[in-house]
C-alpha cells in the first residue's frame, strides 16, 4: 500500500486522470520566479506548498532542531504543520451522525464516514491510521459511553493491537461495547500469521479497511489494492464511505443525550513506535525518545 495510491486513483469515479504531481502541486496561473537570484520568471510552475498528513514528524523535527541540524526557521515548520492539520480537517474524511434513536434503554446512532480524497485514507505507508472517537453524555454532561479514546502515550483505548502486538482490532459494522473501536488501517502479518510492523518480514495483509475513494469497487479491483478482512464482506463499506451503527445500553441515564463523533488520525501509530524498542541501535533509540516526548 505504501506504493499504491496512484493505482487506487484510476479505480475511482474521478474522470480526469492525472499525475500525482499535477494533483498535489497544481500549476501557478501566472509567471513566477523559481529562484531568488538569476533567471527569468517561468510559466506553468507547480506550487511547492506540498501538504501531506504527517504533522507529527514536522513537529518532531522542529522540537529537536538542534539535535537534528534543522536549518528551517521554527515558524516555518510550525506553519507547515498548521497547513497539514488544516488539510487533514478539511480534505480527508468527514463523519456525519445520520440519526439517533433512544428506546427501551438503548441508544442507537447511525454514522456515515466519507472519504474526501482520491485514494484510500489513510494513504500509503501502513503506520498511519484513522479511527472514530464516539461519545455519549447524559443531560448533565456526565459520560455514558465512549469508544476510541486516546491515551496520553498515543495508544487507543480498546485497541487490541496497541494492548498486545500479537492481536489486532477487527473491522466493525456495529459497535456495542467501549472496548470495540472502528480503526481504519492496514495490518500486515508475517509467515507465522502474527501481526508485524516489519516491511521485510510481512508476507500479506490480514486487514485493510482504509476508507475507499468514491467509485472504488472492492469486488473488482486488483489484488494489489484490495480490501482485506471483515470490511470485504461489509455491505456498508463501499467506495466513498462506510456506515456504522453504535448500539449501547444507557440504563437509567437521563436524556436528552449529547452524541458526538470525530475522526482522529495518527501518521505514526503507537504500535509502530513501540515496536522499535526491540532495536538497540542509536537511531531507533533516538526516535523512541522523540516519540515519547511528543506523545
Task: Give the location of each predicted region.
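Primarily the internal scaffold of c-type cytochrome electron-transfer domains
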Residues: 1-228, 233-238, 244-251, 260-295
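Extracellular Ig-like/FN3 beta-sandwich strand-entry sites
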Residues: 254-256
Amino acid at each position: 500500500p505504501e506504493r499504491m495510491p496512484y493505482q487506487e486513483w484510476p479505480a475511482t469515479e474521478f474522470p480526469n486522470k492525472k499525475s500525482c504531481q499535477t494533483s498535489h502541486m497544481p500549476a501557478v496561473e501566472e509567471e513566477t520566479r523559481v529562484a531568488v537570484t538569476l533567471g527569468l520568471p517561468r510559466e506553468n510552475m507547480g506550487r511547492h506548498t506540498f501538504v501531506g498528513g504527517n504533522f507529527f514528524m514536522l513537529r518532531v523535527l522542529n522540537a529537536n532542531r538542534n539535535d537534528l541540524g534543522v536549518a528551517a526557521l521554527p515558524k516555518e515548520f510550525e506553519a507547515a504543520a498548521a497547513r497539514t492539520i488544516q488539510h487533514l480537517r478539511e480534505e480527508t474524511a468527514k463523519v456525519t451522525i445520520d440519526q439517533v434513536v433512544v428506546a427501551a434503554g438503548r441508544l442507537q446512532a447511525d454514522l456515515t464516514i466519507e472519504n474526501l480524497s482520491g485514494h484510500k485514507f489513510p494513504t500509503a505507508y501502513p503506520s498511519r491510521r484513522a479511527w472514530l472517537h464516539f461519545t455519549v453524555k447524559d443531560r448533565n454532561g456526565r459520560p455514558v459511553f465512549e469508544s476510541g479514546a486516546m491515551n496520553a502515550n498515543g495508544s487507543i483505548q480498546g485497541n487490541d493491537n496497541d494492548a498486545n502486538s500479537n492481536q489486532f482490532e477487527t473491522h466493525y459494522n456495529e459497535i456495542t461495547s467501549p472496548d470495540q473501536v472502528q480503526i481504519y488501517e492496514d495490518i500486515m502479518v508475517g509467515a507465522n500469521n502474527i501481526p508485524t510492523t516489519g516491511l521485510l518480514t510481512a508476507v500479506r495483509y490480514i486487514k485493510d479497511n482504509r476508507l475507499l475513494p468514491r467509485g472504488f469497487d472492492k469486488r473488482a479491483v486488483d489484488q494489489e489494492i484490495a480490501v482485506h478482512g471483515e470490511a470485504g464482506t461489509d455491505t456498508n463499506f463501499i467506495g466513498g464511505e462506510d456506515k456504522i451503527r453504535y448500539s449501547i445500553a444507557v440504563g437509567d441515564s437521563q436524556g436528552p443525550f449529547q452524541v458526538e463523533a470525530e475522526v482522529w488520525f495518527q501518521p505514526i501509530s503507537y504500535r509502530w513506535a513501540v515496536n522499535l524498542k526491540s532495536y538497540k541501535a542509536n537511531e531507533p533509540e533516538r526516535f523512541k525518545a522523540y516519540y515519547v516526548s511528543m506523545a
